[in-house]
């Protein structure tokens, strides 16, 4: 009997390596693919295992594949990564917004471009090392994404863009394990990456200095005015891409009081600063909505909502608005609701969906 073929996205890290091992143990025909999505150059080799696209990472993935006895290939996805992730990342900062590149990569590269490539070579599924639980719910009549067993490793926030087709064709076996269990499995299989450290947050910025990256990639960054809450000029900023809502440190301004970034105005190249209470808000409007648990949103819905990757969820009312937008009104104030970031909605363990924050404001009365 022919085995079901699964393509595993192998980064050379522990999670994707254990994903491949578990699926192989379960009887699948596993093919490892490492996605070459960014050319980090020679600098990456000095960073070793911290970057996903270095020769070290590719070699680690190959060594794991050899240990498991599976095929392994390196495929070039640089063009679509440049377009959908790098260009998006820089353009959003130039617009005074704070992007989330992992969401864009998952949405357009891993679960679209890689899935299409996998299906074209006869695979029925792709698999990744994300910590989430995928399945089908008879109650909802939908393919679903649920929070993982290990809540500390929960990655559902960056998966809200997945479609029904993508969820149906994707496996995430680590959703049922804790990180400690995953490392133990890696040791039990004798995988050469069992003790490897976690990868960095933004894979294409090797030194974690996104300001340096933007200076090199983006043209037209200019200094401009810092304004107080009355609209008066109180200083100069170095360029709006270098700041984000809620930021206090690194403003370079001696004001005699603690000031925070309250608003970024790209049209006037201005940044408004104010006291901490000014960065708290209850309501937001979001666009580019993707729903997983429901086909559509016809009426207000009580949800748990999350405005940043590491933030806690908070009770909120989700409201459909014209032109495909949604409004979110939190029951309690939230800190630093930031345009460009994602707001993601949950019902219990189930991921309802998410959207991109456009603005804050009291739309909800």
Curated annotation (Swiss-Prot):
The record marks 130, 341 as: Interaction with tRNA. It is an enzyme of class 2 (transferase). Residues 153-155, 308-309 are annotated as: Interaction with tRNA. Its EC number is 2.8.1.13. The active site is at residues 105, 203. Keywords: ATP-binding, Cytoplasm, Disulfide bond, Nucleotide-binding, RNA-binding, Transferase, tRNA processing, tRNA-binding. It is found in: Cytoplasm. The keyword Protein transport does not apply. Its main location: cytoplasm. ATP binds at residues 9-16, 35, 129. Catalyzes the 2-thiolation of uridine at the wobble position (U34) of tRNA, leading to the formation of s(2)U34. This is tRNA-specific 2-thiouridylase MnmA. It comes from Pelotomaculum thermopropionicum (strain DSM 13744 / JCM 10971 / SI). The lineage of its organism: Bacteria, Bacillati, Bacillota, Clostridia, Eubacteriales. The gene is mnmA.
